[in-house]
Swiss-Prot record:
The lineage of its organism: Eukaryota, Metazoa, Chordata, Craniata, Vertebrata. This is Ubiquitin-conjugating enzyme E2 Q1. It comes from the Eukaryota. Autoubiquitinated in vitro in the presence of NEDD4L. The active site is at C351 (glycyl thioester intermediate). Residues 212-221 have a biased composition (Basic and acidic residues). It comes from Homo sapiens. The modification N-acetylmethionine is found at M1.
Amino acid sequence: MQQPQPQGQQQPGPGQQLGGQGAAPGAGGGPGGGPGPGPCLRRELKLLESIFHRGHERFRIASACLDELSCEFLLAGAGGAGAGAAPGPHLPPRGSVPGDPVRIHCNITESYPAVPPIWSVESDDPNLAAVLERLVDIKKGNTLLLQHLKRIISDLCKLYNLPQHPDVEMLDQPLPAEQCTQEDVSSEDEDEEMPEDTEDLDHYEMKEEEPAEGKKSEDDGIGKENLAILEKIKKNQRQDYLNGAVSGSVQATDRLMKELRDIYRSQSFKGGNYAVELVNDSLYDWNVKLLKVDQDSALHNDLQILKEKEGADFILLNFSFKDNFPFDPPFVRVVSPVLSGGYVLGGGAICMELLTKQGWSSAYSIESVIMQISATLVKGKARVQFGANKSQYSLTRAQQSYKSLVQIHEKNGWYTPPKEDG
């Protein structure tokens, strides 16, 4: 969304911009304009990445290089607030989706730290503009970036009535003095090496800066084909971010990536009990094939017959996730084949307390949900309806059935059958 330009500054794009001294990004440095950002800035960026990593619960560095920084302030998860709700008197930024973080961007000129960073926020909320306006009070120092971010995080916590995060105090730790003074005044030999260093750091993605051991353990046990899928997802996310077409939330995306990694490592997945495919490469839309059910069940026999008739011996489920996952359950429905029994409702919705807000827990893993659904279908004596009209299963009908299901059970509670009934 476009904003009126702050006086004395140019507006580079959406959101509000403040915090610099009127210099356009990239201006004021280079020949005749100062030496450009030195090693001190690099160490500031690395310190920020080590403190506010992509898994941080309050503030995250999304990406960083020598001339630009992108970060996110998370509103949910503190002070007993539910997902998607910002506790306290101030509401989330106008025009934002509940649960979305406050996205903040910073342009760093070549004359930093002589010229302070220039900040902007993806919102037209005047309260957020006021937070950035107060940065003009901080004008001097070799670590202006750290000082600015400490003020921003502290003021945002106050604005949303959130407790001050203890990690903010870590921004006060000094950088090695000899590396911020002697190296900033480089010799001619060091100046000749700077372009190579700068080129590397201009493409520095904070999320990818991981210890070799950490990355090895993260990918350990995942097949090459599935690693390629994960890498494609991350590449698409970076491209969407650059195009300004980010979907979902950081919170949900991080959790879904973890769930997918865990599934790819799982013995049940590797053993062929089920398969997972992303619909149109979307992390928020999964097709799950139940490939194996209890071999002693009538459902298993039906699937064997289905294979002979139609060439498919699996039950296809669809999982759709919202931005506030994992605090809300996924919406799960049967896509095919048409089933009777098994707690499957009209349209393909599934009657399970586990899949409602009342019965859901953010601690549940997606694999455990998949296996529970498989067991529930068998216990509910699900059978394939051969010759049934396949069009009776649709997303719209499933959502309608699910809504009615929730309303009924909110009034009457859930019935737990005796153990002898399965």
